[in-house]
Amino acid sequence: VEETGGRVHRVAVGGGACGEYIPQAIAQGCDTFVTSDLRYNDFLDTRGLNLIDAGHFPTENIVCPTVKAYLEEHFPEVKTVISTSHRDVIQYYL
């Protein structure tokens, strides 16, 4: 939150690689954008916008239960499962 003086007022979220939508986030008045797979130059070229690269898998996988519930409600005859073998290929260390 360095770019906004420690305050966050409006956040845009893009699951997966959504760096191309940075201009739209700014146009919508967002001061923070959470997505993944950002390029080095995205951080250098974007002033006044907090960028958070939260990882590709974590930003997409989180919606799987919601999508599954939607599909089950609208297509009850179709069996839906969430993969247990699909895992994040990146290990994060803090």
Q: What are the residue ranges of the model-derived segments?
A:
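Active-site catalytic microenvironments in core metabolic enzymes, especially phosphate/sugar-handling
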Residues: 1-94
